[in-house]
Amino acid sequence: MIRHIVAFRLRPEVTAEQAAALLAELDDFPRRFPAMRRFTSGRNTSTRDDRFTHAFSVEFETEQELADYLAGEQHETFVAEVFRPLVEERAIVSYEYSPSEGDIMTAPARQHAPYGMEYARIEVPDIQATIDFLVYHVGLQLEQHTEERAYLRADIEHHSIELISAPQREVGHTVAVGFSVESIEVLSTLQKRVADAGFEILDLEERQQALCGEGFATVDPNGLVVELFTDFQEYAEAPHVEIRPLDLVHPFLVTDNFDATVAFYQDVLGFLPSDHVVGSTTFFRSEDRYHHSLAISRNRDEGTFVAHLCFAMKSFDHVMRMRARALYKGSPIASDLVNHSASTSIAFYLHDPQHGPRFELCDRHRVFTPEEQETHRPRRMPADPRNIDVWRPAADDWGRF
Protein backbone atom coordinates (compact mmCIF):
# COMPACT_ATOMS: atom_id res chain seq x y z
CA MET A 1 0.00 0.00 0.00
CA ILE A 2 1.03 3.61 -0.61
CA ARG A 3 0.13 6.19 2.03
CA HIS A 4 -0.12 9.79 0.80
CA ILE A 5 -0.28 12.63 3.37
CA VAL A 6 -0.83 16.33 2.70
CA ALA A 7 -0.53 18.93 5.49
CA PHE A 8 -1.41 22.54 4.73
CA ARG A 9 -1.97 25.98 6.25
CA LEU A 10 -4.79 28.20 5.04
CA ARG A 11 -4.09 31.82 4.19
CA PRO A 12 -5.01 34.28 6.98
CA GLU A 13 -7.61 36.01 4.81
CA VAL A 14 -9.54 32.80 4.08
CA THR A 15 -13.08 33.07 5.47
CA ALA A 16 -14.81 30.37 7.47
CA GLU A 17 -17.17 29.73 4.55
CA GLN A 18 -14.27 29.31 2.10
CA ALA A 19 -12.49 26.96 4.49
CA ALA A 20 -15.63 24.88 4.98
CA ALA A 21 -16.17 24.62 1.22
CA LEU A 22 -12.57 23.48 0.67
CA LEU A 23 -12.75 20.84 3.40
CA ALA A 24 -16.11 19.60 2.10
CA GLU A 25 -14.64 19.16 -1.38
CA LEU A 26 -11.68 17.26 0.07
CA ASP A 27 -14.03 14.98 1.99
CA ASP A 28 -15.83 14.22 -1.28
CA PHE A 29 -12.62 12.84 -2.82
CA PRO A 30 -13.31 9.14 -2.05
CA ARG A 31 -16.52 9.31 -4.09
CA ARG A 32 -14.79 11.01 -7.03
CA PHE A 33 -11.65 8.85 -6.90
CA PRO A 34 -12.72 5.26 -6.11
CA ALA A 35 -9.11 4.01 -6.14
CA MET A 36 -8.62 5.80 -2.81
CA ARG A 37 -8.54 3.80 0.43
CA ARG A 38 -8.87 4.96 4.06
CA PHE A 39 -9.29 8.66 3.37
CA THR A 40 -9.24 10.78 6.54
CA SER A 41 -8.96 14.52 7.09
CA GLY A 42 -9.02 16.94 9.99
CA ARG A 43 -7.74 20.04 11.76
CA ASN A 44 -4.25 20.01 13.27
CA THR A 45 -4.54 19.57 17.06
CA SER A 46 -0.83 19.18 17.81
CA THR A 47 0.53 21.19 20.75
CA ARG A 48 4.11 20.80 19.48
CA ASP A 49 3.85 22.12 15.91
CA ASP A 50 1.02 24.34 14.71
CA ARG A 51 2.65 25.42 11.45
CA PHE A 52 -0.05 23.59 9.45
CA THR A 53 -3.74 24.05 10.18
CA HIS A 54 -5.13 20.96 8.43
CA ALA A 55 -4.11 17.61 6.93
CA PHE A 56 -5.52 14.67 5.05
CA SER A 57 -4.28 11.13 4.56
CA VAL A 58 -5.21 8.63 1.86
CA GLU A 59 -3.95 5.26 0.66
CA PHE A 60 -3.61 3.58 -2.74
CA GLU A 61 -2.86 -0.02 -3.58
CA THR A 62 0.01 0.83 -5.95
CA GLU A 63 2.32 3.70 -6.86
CA GLN A 64 0.70 3.74 -10.30
CA GLU A 65 -2.74 4.40 -8.79
CA LEU A 66 -1.28 7.33 -6.83
CA ALA A 67 0.45 8.64 -9.96
CA ASP A 68 -2.78 8.35 -11.98
CA TYR A 69 -4.67 10.28 -9.30
CA LEU A 70 -2.06 13.06 -9.13
CA ALA A 71 -1.84 13.40 -12.93
CA GLY A 72 -5.59 13.24 -13.49
CA GLU A 73 -7.45 16.22 -14.88
CA GLN A 74 -9.88 16.39 -11.95
CA HIS A 75 -7.05 16.55 -9.41
CA GLU A 76 -5.03 19.12 -11.36
CA THR A 77 -8.10 21.33 -11.80
CA PHE A 78 -8.89 21.13 -8.07
CA VAL A 79 -5.32 22.05 -7.10
CA ALA A 80 -5.11 24.97 -9.53
CA GLU A 81 -8.57 26.46 -9.03
CA VAL A 82 -9.53 25.57 -5.45
CA PHE A 83 -6.58 24.45 -3.32
CA ARG A 84 -3.70 26.78 -4.20
CA PRO A 85 -5.70 30.05 -4.01
CA LEU A 86 -6.61 29.26 -0.37
CA VAL A 87 -3.44 27.55 0.86
CA GLU A 88 -0.36 29.46 1.99
CA GLU A 89 1.94 26.50 2.64
CA ARG A 90 1.78 22.74 2.30
CA ALA A 91 3.92 19.64 2.86
CA ILE A 92 3.46 16.30 1.09
CA VAL A 93 4.75 12.87 2.13
CA SER A 94 4.17 9.52 0.39
CA TYR A 95 5.55 6.16 1.50
CA GLU A 96 5.00 2.45 1.00
CA TYR A 97 3.95 0.14 3.81
CA SER A 98 2.60 -3.37 4.33
CA PRO A 99 -0.89 -3.45 5.89
CA SER A 100 -1.60 -5.69 8.85
CA GLU A 101 -3.01 -9.09 7.98
CA GLY A 102 -6.78 -9.03 7.94
CA ASP A 103 -7.00 -5.25 7.73
CA ILE A 104 -10.39 -4.98 6.03
CA MET A 105 -10.06 -1.24 5.52
CA THR A 106 -7.60 -1.84 2.68
CA ALA A 107 -10.34 -3.40 0.53
CA PRO A 108 -11.11 -1.62 -2.76
CA ALA A 109 -13.81 1.02 -2.66
CA ARG A 110 -15.62 -0.68 -5.56
CA GLN A 111 -16.01 -4.30 -6.50
CA HIS A 112 -13.71 -5.43 -9.29
CA ALA A 113 -15.07 -6.91 -12.48
CA PRO A 114 -13.33 -9.55 -14.61
CA TYR A 115 -10.30 -8.19 -16.45
CA GLY A 116 -11.33 -8.77 -20.06
CA MET A 117 -12.77 -11.18 -22.61
CA GLU A 118 -10.50 -14.00 -23.73
CA TYR A 119 -12.59 -16.37 -25.86
CA ALA A 120 -15.95 -17.57 -27.10
CA ARG A 121 -16.87 -21.24 -27.45
CA ILE A 122 -19.01 -21.85 -30.54
CA GLU A 123 -20.75 -25.01 -31.69
CA VAL A 124 -20.79 -25.19 -35.51
CA PRO A 125 -22.25 -27.67 -38.03
CA ASP A 126 -19.14 -27.80 -40.26
CA ILE A 127 -16.01 -27.20 -38.23
CA GLN A 128 -13.61 -27.13 -41.19
CA ALA A 129 -15.71 -24.58 -43.05
CA THR A 130 -15.75 -22.32 -39.99
CA ILE A 131 -11.99 -22.69 -39.53
CA ASP A 132 -11.47 -21.61 -43.13
CA PHE A 133 -13.84 -18.66 -42.65
CA LEU A 134 -12.13 -17.43 -39.47
CA VAL A 135 -8.62 -17.77 -40.86
CA TYR A 136 -9.36 -15.95 -44.12
CA HIS A 137 -12.00 -13.41 -43.12
CA VAL A 138 -11.08 -12.63 -39.50
CA GLY A 139 -7.34 -13.27 -39.63
CA LEU A 140 -7.15 -15.79 -36.79
CA GLN A 141 -4.43 -18.44 -36.65
CA LEU A 142 -5.36 -22.10 -36.23
CA GLU A 143 -3.36 -23.74 -33.43
CA GLN A 144 -4.99 -27.05 -32.58
CA HIS A 145 -7.48 -29.08 -34.56
CA THR A 146 -9.23 -32.42 -34.23
CA GLU A 147 -12.44 -33.61 -35.83
CA GLU A 148 -14.32 -32.51 -32.71
CA ARG A 149 -12.58 -29.30 -31.62
CA ALA A 150 -10.37 -26.44 -32.82
CA TYR A 151 -8.58 -23.51 -31.19
CA LEU A 152 -7.81 -20.29 -33.06
CA ARG A 153 -5.97 -17.27 -31.67
CA ALA A 154 -5.62 -13.59 -32.47
CA ASP A 155 -2.55 -12.65 -30.42
CA ILE A 156 -0.48 -14.33 -27.70
CA GLU A 157 -3.44 -15.58 -25.66
CA HIS A 158 -3.96 -19.33 -26.00
CA HIS A 159 -7.13 -18.90 -28.05
CA SER A 160 -9.80 -16.39 -28.93
CA ILE A 161 -12.25 -18.85 -30.49
CA GLU A 162 -12.89 -22.46 -29.52
CA LEU A 163 -14.93 -24.39 -32.07
CA ILE A 164 -16.94 -27.48 -31.20
CA SER A 165 -18.14 -29.76 -33.98
CA ALA A 166 -21.95 -30.00 -33.79
CA PRO A 167 -23.21 -31.48 -37.09
CA GLN A 168 -26.73 -31.69 -35.62
CA ARG A 169 -26.96 -27.87 -35.67
CA GLU A 170 -28.11 -25.96 -38.73
CA VAL A 171 -26.38 -22.73 -37.64
CA GLY A 172 -23.50 -21.93 -35.33
CA HIS A 173 -24.32 -21.14 -31.70
CA THR A 174 -22.17 -19.54 -29.00
CA VAL A 175 -22.44 -21.63 -25.83
CA ALA A 176 -19.83 -20.03 -23.57
CA VAL A 177 -17.66 -16.97 -23.10
CA GLY A 178 -14.48 -16.73 -21.06
CA PHE A 179 -13.15 -13.75 -19.09
CA SER A 180 -9.78 -13.53 -17.39
CA VAL A 181 -9.50 -12.23 -13.82
CA GLU A 182 -6.59 -10.23 -12.43
CA SER A 183 -5.84 -12.26 -9.30
CA ILE A 184 -6.88 -15.14 -7.07
CA GLU A 185 -8.25 -12.58 -4.60
CA VAL A 186 -10.55 -11.01 -7.19
CA LEU A 187 -11.58 -14.47 -8.44
CA SER A 188 -12.51 -15.55 -4.91
CA THR A 189 -14.55 -12.39 -4.41
CA LEU A 190 -16.34 -12.94 -7.72
CA GLN A 191 -17.13 -16.53 -6.82
CA LYS A 192 -18.59 -15.45 -3.48
CA ARG A 193 -20.73 -12.77 -5.12
CA VAL A 194 -22.02 -15.26 -7.70
CA ALA A 195 -22.89 -17.80 -5.01
CA ASP A 196 -24.46 -15.18 -2.72
CA ALA A 197 -26.67 -14.05 -5.62
CA GLY A 198 -28.03 -17.58 -5.97
CA PHE A 199 -26.21 -18.62 -9.16
CA GLU A 200 -24.73 -22.09 -9.39
CA ILE A 201 -20.95 -22.48 -9.16
CA LEU A 202 -19.69 -24.94 -11.79
CA ASP A 203 -16.32 -26.35 -12.75
CA LEU A 204 -14.58 -24.94 -15.79
CA GLU A 205 -14.95 -27.01 -18.94
CA GLU A 206 -12.48 -29.89 -18.63
CA ARG A 207 -10.08 -28.79 -21.36
CA GLN A 208 -10.17 -25.19 -20.18
CA GLN A 209 -9.03 -26.30 -16.72
CA ALA A 210 -5.70 -27.31 -18.25
CA LEU A 211 -5.26 -23.91 -19.96
CA CYS A 212 -5.45 -21.58 -16.95
CA GLY A 213 -4.78 -21.30 -13.23
CA GLU A 214 -7.77 -21.23 -10.91
CA GLY A 215 -11.30 -20.66 -12.11
CA PHE A 216 -14.98 -21.47 -12.04
CA ALA A 217 -18.01 -21.23 -14.30
CA THR A 218 -21.59 -20.15 -13.89
CA VAL A 219 -24.63 -19.67 -16.12
CA ASP A 220 -26.11 -16.25 -16.81
CA PRO A 221 -29.91 -15.63 -16.85
CA ASN A 222 -30.01 -16.53 -20.56
CA GLY A 223 -28.32 -19.92 -20.23
CA LEU A 224 -24.95 -18.69 -21.51
CA VAL A 225 -22.01 -20.27 -19.69
CA VAL A 226 -19.60 -17.68 -18.28
CA GLU A 227 -16.12 -18.94 -17.38
CA LEU A 228 -13.88 -16.88 -15.08
CA PHE A 229 -10.24 -17.74 -14.45
CA THR A 230 -6.70 -16.55 -13.74
CA ASP A 231 -3.42 -17.09 -15.59
CA PHE A 232 -4.68 -17.92 -19.07
CA GLN A 233 -1.89 -19.60 -21.02
CA GLU A 234 0.02 -17.48 -23.53
CA TYR A 235 2.32 -18.08 -26.47
CA ALA A 236 5.78 -16.52 -26.48
CA GLU A 237 5.02 -14.63 -29.68
CA ALA A 238 1.99 -13.35 -31.55
CA PRO A 239 1.14 -15.04 -34.86
CA HIS A 240 3.51 -14.04 -37.66
CA VAL A 241 0.58 -12.78 -39.71
CA GLU A 242 0.46 -9.14 -40.72
CA ILE A 243 -3.30 -8.73 -41.16
CA ARG A 244 -4.85 -10.13 -38.01
CA PRO A 245 -6.75 -8.95 -34.93
CA LEU A 246 -4.91 -7.70 -31.87
CA ASP A 247 -7.59 -8.59 -29.35
CA LEU A 248 -11.04 -10.01 -28.77
CA VAL A 249 -12.85 -7.01 -27.30
CA HIS A 250 -16.41 -7.98 -26.39
CA PRO A 251 -19.52 -10.07 -26.91
CA PHE A 252 -22.82 -8.37 -27.74
CA LEU A 253 -25.76 -10.13 -26.11
CA VAL A 254 -29.37 -9.88 -27.29
CA THR A 255 -31.85 -10.98 -24.64
CA ASP A 256 -35.55 -11.09 -23.83
CA ASN A 257 -34.53 -11.04 -20.15
CA PHE A 258 -32.83 -7.65 -20.19
CA ASP A 259 -33.24 -6.48 -16.59
CA ALA A 260 -32.08 -9.76 -15.05
CA THR A 261 -29.14 -9.94 -17.47
CA VAL A 262 -28.04 -6.39 -16.65
CA ALA A 263 -28.36 -7.13 -12.93
CA PHE A 264 -26.20 -10.25 -13.26
CA TYR A 265 -23.35 -8.63 -15.15
CA GLN A 266 -23.45 -5.28 -13.34
CA ASP A 267 -24.41 -6.10 -9.76
CA VAL A 268 -22.95 -9.59 -9.45
CA LEU A 269 -19.92 -9.60 -11.76
CA GLY A 270 -19.15 -5.90 -11.30
CA PHE A 271 -19.10 -4.66 -14.90
CA LEU A 272 -19.34 -0.85 -15.03
CA PRO A 273 -21.89 0.88 -17.30
CA SER A 274 -20.19 3.13 -19.86
CA ASP A 275 -23.18 4.31 -21.92
CA HIS A 276 -26.88 3.63 -22.41
CA VAL A 277 -29.01 3.81 -25.52
CA VAL A 278 -32.27 4.31 -23.64
CA GLY A 279 -34.68 1.42 -23.95
CA SER A 280 -32.29 -0.52 -26.15
CA THR A 281 -28.71 -1.23 -25.13
CA THR A 282 -26.24 -0.81 -22.27
CA PHE A 283 -22.48 -0.92 -22.81
CA PHE A 284 -20.33 -2.23 -19.96
CA ARG A 285 -16.60 -2.01 -19.31
CA SER A 286 -14.37 -4.32 -17.31
CA GLU A 287 -10.88 -3.85 -15.87
CA ASP A 288 -9.14 -3.79 -19.28
CA ARG A 289 -10.69 -0.29 -19.73
CA TYR A 290 -12.17 -0.81 -23.18
CA HIS A 291 -15.26 1.39 -23.54
CA HIS A 292 -17.14 -1.86 -23.48
CA SER A 293 -16.06 -5.42 -22.86
CA LEU A 294 -19.72 -6.42 -22.91
CA ALA A 295 -22.90 -5.05 -24.47
CA ILE A 296 -26.46 -6.10 -23.64
CA SER A 297 -29.42 -5.29 -25.89
CA ARG A 298 -33.15 -5.83 -25.50
CA ASN A 299 -34.73 -8.54 -27.64
CA ARG A 300 -35.70 -7.31 -31.09
CA ASP A 301 -37.91 -10.32 -31.86
CA GLU A 302 -34.79 -12.29 -32.71
CA GLY A 303 -34.51 -14.53 -29.65
CA THR A 304 -31.78 -14.62 -27.00
CA PHE A 305 -28.22 -15.19 -28.19
CA VAL A 306 -24.71 -13.80 -28.66
CA ALA A 307 -25.31 -11.44 -31.58
CA HIS A 308 -21.71 -10.59 -32.38
CA LEU A 309 -18.10 -10.82 -31.28
CA CYS A 310 -15.84 -7.80 -31.73
CA PHE A 311 -12.19 -8.06 -32.75
CA ALA A 312 -9.84 -5.06 -32.71
CA MET A 313 -7.64 -4.84 -35.78
CA LYS A 314 -4.22 -3.18 -35.98
CA SER A 315 -5.41 -0.27 -38.12
CA PHE A 316 -8.24 1.06 -40.24
CA ASP A 317 -6.25 -0.04 -43.28
CA HIS A 318 -6.47 -3.63 -42.03
CA VAL A 319 -10.22 -3.27 -41.44
CA MET A 320 -10.61 -2.19 -45.05
CA ARG A 321 -8.39 -4.99 -46.34
CA MET A 322 -10.59 -7.52 -44.54
CA ARG A 323 -13.65 -5.82 -45.99
CA ALA A 324 -12.09 -6.15 -49.44
CA ARG A 325 -11.60 -9.88 -48.85
CA ALA A 326 -15.28 -10.24 -47.98
CA LEU A 327 -16.34 -8.36 -51.10
CA TYR A 328 -13.98 -10.40 -53.25
CA LYS A 329 -15.30 -13.72 -51.94
CA GLY A 330 -18.91 -12.58 -51.89
CA SER A 331 -19.13 -13.24 -48.16
CA PRO A 332 -22.11 -11.54 -46.53
CA ILE A 333 -21.42 -8.16 -44.93
CA ALA A 334 -24.31 -7.89 -42.51
CA SER A 335 -23.62 -4.26 -41.62
CA ASP A 336 -21.16 -2.14 -43.55
CA LEU A 337 -18.95 0.63 -42.23
CA VAL A 338 -20.27 2.03 -38.94
CA ASN A 339 -18.80 4.93 -36.96
CA HIS A 340 -19.85 4.03 -33.43
CA SER A 341 -21.00 6.85 -31.17
CA ALA A 342 -20.33 4.89 -27.98
CA SER A 343 -16.90 3.35 -28.52
CA THR A 344 -15.70 5.75 -31.30
CA SER A 345 -14.59 2.72 -33.33
CA ILE A 346 -15.13 2.27 -37.06
CA ALA A 347 -16.14 -1.25 -38.02
CA PHE A 348 -17.98 -3.58 -40.33
CA TYR A 349 -19.73 -6.87 -39.58
CA LEU A 350 -19.50 -10.24 -41.30
CA HIS A 351 -22.22 -12.83 -40.82
CA ASP A 352 -22.64 -16.31 -42.19
CA PRO A 353 -25.02 -18.08 -39.76
CA GLN A 354 -23.33 -21.46 -40.11
CA HIS A 355 -20.25 -19.98 -38.40
CA GLY A 356 -22.08 -18.52 -35.40
CA PRO A 357 -22.50 -14.84 -34.50
CA ARG A 358 -21.59 -11.81 -36.52
CA PHE A 359 -17.90 -10.98 -36.45
CA GLU A 360 -17.17 -7.28 -36.00
CA LEU A 361 -13.76 -6.07 -37.20
CA CYS A 362 -13.01 -2.63 -35.79
CA ASP A 363 -10.34 0.01 -35.38
CA ARG A 364 -9.84 2.59 -32.62
CA HIS A 365 -12.19 1.23 -30.00
CA ARG A 366 -12.01 3.71 -27.14
CA VAL A 367 -9.83 2.81 -24.15
CA PHE A 368 -10.45 4.78 -20.96
CA THR A 369 -7.59 6.31 -19.01
CA PRO A 370 -7.16 4.98 -15.46
CA GLU A 371 -8.89 8.12 -14.15
CA GLU A 372 -11.78 7.78 -16.61
CA GLN A 373 -12.15 4.14 -15.63
CA GLU A 374 -13.00 5.22 -12.09
CA THR A 375 -14.88 8.47 -12.72
CA HIS A 376 -16.66 8.14 -16.10
CA ARG A 377 -20.39 8.80 -15.91
CA PRO A 378 -22.45 6.91 -18.52
CA ARG A 379 -24.39 8.91 -21.06
CA ARG A 380 -28.10 8.32 -21.58
CA MET A 381 -28.59 8.61 -25.33
CA PRO A 382 -32.03 8.44 -26.99
CA ALA A 383 -32.81 5.51 -29.27
CA ASP A 384 -31.78 7.21 -32.50
CA PRO A 385 -29.69 5.57 -35.24
CA ARG A 386 -27.30 8.54 -35.06
CA ASN A 387 -26.52 7.49 -31.48
CA ILE A 388 -25.36 4.14 -32.80
CA ASP A 389 -23.65 5.25 -36.02
CA VAL A 390 -22.79 8.96 -36.15
CA TRP A 391 -22.63 8.79 -39.95
CA ARG A 392 -26.39 8.15 -40.19
CA PRO A 393 -28.04 11.21 -41.78
CA ALA A 394 -31.46 11.12 -40.14
CA ALA A 395 -33.43 9.89 -37.14
CA ASP A 396 -35.38 7.38 -39.26
CA ASP A 397 -32.33 5.79 -40.93
CA TRP A 398 -32.58 2.43 -39.16
CA GLY A 399 -31.72 0.28 -42.17
CA ARG A 400 -28.46 -1.57 -42.79
CA PHE A 401 -27.69 -2.40 -39.13
Locations of the language-model features?
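Short S/T/G/P-rich N-terminal loop/turn motif that feeds into the first structured element of a domain
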Residues: M1-T53, E61-A71, S94-M105
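N-terminal beta-strand motif that seeds the catalytic metal site of vicinal oxygen chelate
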Residues: I2-A7, M105-Q128, T174-F179, D231-D259, ...
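Core segments of cupin and vicinal oxygen chelate
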Residues: A20, H112, R121-H159, Q209, ...
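Short secondary-structure junctions
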Residues: F29-R38, P85-L86, A197-F199, K329-P332
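Conserved short beta-strand elements that form part of the metal-binding/catalytic scaffold
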Residues: F39, L140-H173, L224-F232, H276-V306, ...
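Vicinal oxygen chelate
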Residues: I92-S94, D103-R110, G116-P125, Q168-R244, D247-D256, T282-R285, ...
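Conserved active-site tyrosine of GNAT-family acetyltransferases
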Residues: T130-V135, V194, G223, T261, ...
